[in-house]
């Protein structure tokens, strides 16, 4: 069974009244290469930026190795008036009955016949689902009591995390940007060294050794003394990938790494990423490169209008799309 290292539950991001991400849930397993595809404006880049807290999510839970590093439920963002809240409360009451009934069915079957070992994981999952519904903040307020509702809205907790904690998360979930985010006046080697000495407090010699190792792995060993502004776009992206690797992250987040490149440079970067995928490092890649998604990723997620519309293995997504929206997207992309 694969180890889930990043768990995303009901992640939402609002900019004012604009809902950019709407209840995104996704499990990321160790060694996954996940391609996030979808039209421009579907929330893909915002999703990545929320994962390592470059953007503060509005609500949801983000857990790394089962330990939440972001967890908040904001009633005031979801239920703009009392009537909406009452509807939500009624919905969760029904969900509570449904999950409780499901749990009872599995437990009774197991009591009757303990040889049915396959029921154990079902019971465990049913308990988890029941507790999740029961502990939802919506269920903790009596919806007949308007005063209690108003008080709860005022007492909605705000998200609190220190910069030190954010920096720690970013050493595990490192971002590679489409715009490179390199220091133009530094040389290639120093860009990779600086990331380590500032973030991980490694000594210079150790950082230099690690930088040379990863620059060699992306075929940039002959340009280590070049200034960043002397490189092509493809070479800059390779340096950005090497810099990310120097931090020794468990997950690398790629935000459209080839979109700012000339066509002839795209293959240069994609080949480095393909080679990287064979090492077993976990990657989440926002991309418009359908061949990469089809041939390198082991999971493809299609997003549209802030939702995950479909997800699955590449063959499942590309050869047997279930929704008309994905079919239309693939038809346009294939032209």
Regions found by a protein language model. Name each.
Residues 227-231, 235:
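Conserved ABC ATPase signature
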Residues 52:
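Helix-to-loop junction immediately C-terminal to a conserved catalytic motif
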Residues 252-255:
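Catalytic Walker B motif of ABC-type/P-loop ATPase nucleotide-binding domains
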């Amino acid at each position: 069974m694969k180890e889930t290292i990043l768990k995303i539950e009901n992640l939402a991001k609002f900019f004012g009244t604009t809902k950019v991400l709407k209840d995104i849930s996704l499990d990321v397993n160790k060694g996954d290469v996940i391609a996030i595809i979808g039209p421009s404006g579907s929330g893909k880049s915002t999703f990545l930026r929320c994962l390592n807290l470059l953007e503060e999510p509005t609500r949801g839970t983000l857990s790394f190795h089962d330990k939440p590093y972001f967890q908040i439920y904001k009633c005031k963002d979801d239920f703009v008036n009392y009537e909406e809240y009452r509807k939500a409360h009624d919905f969760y009451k029904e969900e509570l009955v449904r999950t409780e009934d499901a749990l009872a069915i599995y437990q009774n079957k197991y009591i009757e016949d303990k040889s049915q070992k396959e029921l154990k994981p079902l019971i465990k999952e049913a308990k988890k689902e029941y507790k999740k519904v029961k502990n939802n903040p919506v269920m903790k307020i009596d919806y007949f009591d308007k005063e209690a509702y108003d008080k709860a809205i005022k007492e909605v907790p705000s998200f609190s995390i220190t910069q030190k904690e954010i920096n720690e998360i970013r050493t595990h979930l490192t971002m590679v940007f489409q715009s490179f985010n390199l220091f133009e006046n530094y040389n290639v080697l120093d860009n990779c060294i600086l990331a380590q000495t500032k973030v991980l407090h490694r000594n210079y010699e150790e950082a230099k050794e690690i930088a040379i190792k990863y620059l060699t792995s992306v075929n940039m060993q002959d340009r280590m003394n070049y200034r960043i502004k002397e490189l092509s776009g493809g070479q800059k992206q390779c340096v950005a990938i090497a810099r990310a690797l120097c931090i020794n992250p468990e997950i690398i987040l790629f935000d459209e790494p080839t979109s700012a490149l000339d066509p002839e440079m795209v293959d240069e970067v994609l080949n480095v990423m393909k080679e990287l995928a064979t090492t077993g490092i976990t990657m989440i890649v926002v991309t418009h490169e359908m061949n990469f998604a089809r041939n390198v990723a082991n999971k493809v997620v299609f997003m549209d209008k802030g939702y995950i519309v479909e997800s699955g293995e590449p063959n499942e997504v590309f050869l047997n799309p279930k929704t008309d929206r994905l079919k239309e997207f693939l038809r346009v992309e294939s032209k």
